Amino acid sequence: MRFAIPLGAACAWAGVALAALQIAEDFSSITLNNDRFKAVWSKSKGSVVDMFLDGQDLLGPQSGSTGIGPYLDCYCVPSGFYTAGATNPRMQYVEGTDSTGTKYAGVILNDTYTPTGQQFQQYWFLRDGETGLHMFSRLAYYNETTPFLRNLQEFRTLFRPNTQLWTHLTSSELQTAPLPSKNAVSKQVVVQDATWRFNNTPDDAYYTQFSEYFTKYTFSNQWRDNDVHGLYGDGTNSNGSTYGAWLVMNTKGPLHSDLTVDGIVYNYIVSNHHGEGTPNITNGFDRTFGPQFYLFNGGKGSTSSLQDLRSEAAKLADPSWNAEFYDSIAKHVVGYVPSSKRGSVDGRIKLPKGASNPIAILTVDGQYFQDNSVVPSSYQYWTDIDTSGRFRIDRVVEGKYRLTVYADGIFGDFVRDGVTVRAGKTTTVKEKWDAESAGKEIWRLGTPDKSSGEFRHGVARDPTHPLHPPEYLIYWGAYDWQSDFPKGIDYTIGSSDPATDFNTVHWSVFGPTPDNPNVEYNTTHDWKINFSLTKKQLRNSKKATLTIQLAGAKTASGNTDEYKASEPYINLIHESYINDQKEPLSFVIGFNQSSSCIVRSAVSCYQVRSRMEFPADWLKVGENTLTLHLPYNATDTETAILPATVYVQYDALRLELD
């Protein structure tokens, strides 16, 4: 192996042939190409600036930050955004043959942000016979003078084309649509941060088929469900040949969700749009993220459909895919852990009755699984559990982990700390999950599945457009609270329908929206749940327990986890009143538990829950009422064009008697 060295003035061009794989370098660029795929890196930009599949230009002309990529940027310097390579990009290439006998070549960007000393590395690798780029991204910070810098708020790579080649975008079967036309974009109306209305171009294909509104959040997706996302060209602008550009999510994910594609194909490595925690950048921070794979398929003469090209990409969404190759290039990638330092976990857990869709998660020992980032060096892994309770997770970096299991239909999680993984070994786990219980369940509202999607304007499909996207993905302002619930929420257990009579979000304030300038305060903040109890149910009962699980909540901190003493609702108090009791059952949603959830088209974000006990004699035979209360007209100061109201999104509620 060798690293490229700067070329002297007498040698302006050098090419190195590796059978079908070729490397070329001059003063301004490095080029990698094989029989079908070619990528060109600009040494001055630190990014891919040209890309071709079978001779077809995949990026289009460079214009500012478009027509380039994949490239690395972040929201991680004191001033905010930074694009790796913007200060002093130093580019080099590597080459070799992996353990399978396949030739490879790689390009490595090194850049240091001078004001703080933050070090960025971006790696791109091309293998012979493949039409895509394997990528790793690294950030390091060593600074004893300023040991705490800030949080790593966003860390992402972007494939950002500037061409009419691409005609459709897709992040799932439900989230597939034509790209809005240039005409629609030129006449769009801003309604919210990164959200537009196309009412001026009602004949546009996106409008007629998918939605009147477009936002990058519409195509966000949970990592657990996201194998692949990207762009498709249907041949309209490529002489009939079809093309695909995909980010293969070969590590998948549990509850984390974020942007996937909006004309840009994203790899969101670290982010907090939907309330996930982000790691702090402190002295000694040094993380390498990856691998991820950008695949480009179809090509000259291809007639493959979007679904066909997407399925081809999805077959690669497997953590074991190309493991031998990654081990071979580990010597080039600072911080990548090879297979020799990984082990496996083989488990079987007896699940509670009624559990469905169970998942096993390994995260940092001793912490709630959604708080994995509190230890910046931590790893996480997850896999679905089969119907017999068995699961296996391979390629786990050696160390000590917490095992968390959750399932649809079951309140609470199963947690076990101290699961130790050793390199080259298999750790066996055998457990029984006894579902939490505080007595006899009297009623439940909603399905405990860490989502508020079963309620109104959640996962229900939009009936007004032929592609029928789920309603929650569109834009919260497409719906009108006053029309849906003119008298507020007055729900009766046993007779009301959760899909229509209980909203997917409990607002303190609603509005205005594009079609309704009015702001509603009076019917939003108090919700009533009515239920009947019999003498038999109450007999000998001393204690009652109300469990409330939230799929997301927004306090005055939004999605930043930042404490602002000037904001009265930085910590949000949720209150529940039983019948005519003056004292509520209360729990606090902390500033560091807040999400920007429904306003960014999500029904599952950072989870918050509380189990509250109260005397059974607060209840009575016959009709009872539970009032769910948020502060009246509770708002914050928004710096972006977003609703200022606080809100919560219910996953499920349950009443038990003992």
Curated annotation (Swiss-Prot):
Gene3D superfamilies, per the entry: 2.70.98.10, Carboxypeptidase-like, regulatory domain, Galactose-binding domain-like
Signal peptide per UniProt: 1-19
Swiss-Prot/TrEMBL keywords: Carbohydrate metabolism, Cell wall biogenesis/degradation, Glycoprotein, Lyase, Polysaccharide degradation, Secreted, Signal
Enzyme Commission number(s) from the entry: 4.2.2.23
GO molecular function list: carbohydrate binding; rhamnogalacturonan endolyase activity
Subcellular localization, as worded in the UniProt entry: Secreted
Ligase among keywords: no
UniProt KW Transmembrane helix keyword: no
InterPro entries reported in the protein's UniProt record: Carb-bd-like_fold, Gal_mutarotase_sf_dom, Galactose-bd-like_sf, GH-type_carb-bd, Polysacch_Lyase_4, RG-lyase_II, RG-lyase_III
Annotated catalysed reactions: Endotype eliminative cleavage of L-alpha-rhamnopyranosyl-(1->4)-alpha-D-galactopyranosyluronic acid bonds of rhamnogalacturonan I domains in ramified hairy regions of pectin leaving L-rhamnopyranose at the reducing end and 4-deoxy-4,5-unsaturated D-galactopyranosyluronic acid at the non-reducing end
Enzyme class: lyase
Glycosylation sites per record: N110, N143, N239, N280, N522, N530, N592, N633
Recorded GO CC terms: extracellular region
Listed GO biological process terms: cell wall organization; polysaccharide catabolic process
Main localization category: secreted
SUPFAM superfamilies referenced in this protein's UniProt entry, alphabetically: Galactose mutarotase-like, Galactose-binding domain-like, Starch-binding domain-like
Residues in coiled coil: none
Domain of life: Eukaryota
Family: Belongs to the polysaccharide lyase 4 family.
Function field: Pectinolytic enzymes consist of four classes of enzymes: pectin lyase, polygalacturonase, pectin methylesterase and rhamnogalacturonase. Degrades the rhamnogalacturonan I (RG-I) backbone of pectin.
Protein name per UniProt: Probable rhamnogalacturonate lyase B
The species this protein was found in: Aspergillus fumigatus (strain ATCC MYA-4609 / CBS 101355 / FGSC A1100 / Af293) (Neosartorya fumigata)
Classification of source organism: Eukaryota, Fungi, Dikarya, Ascomycota, Pezizomycotina
Gene: rglB
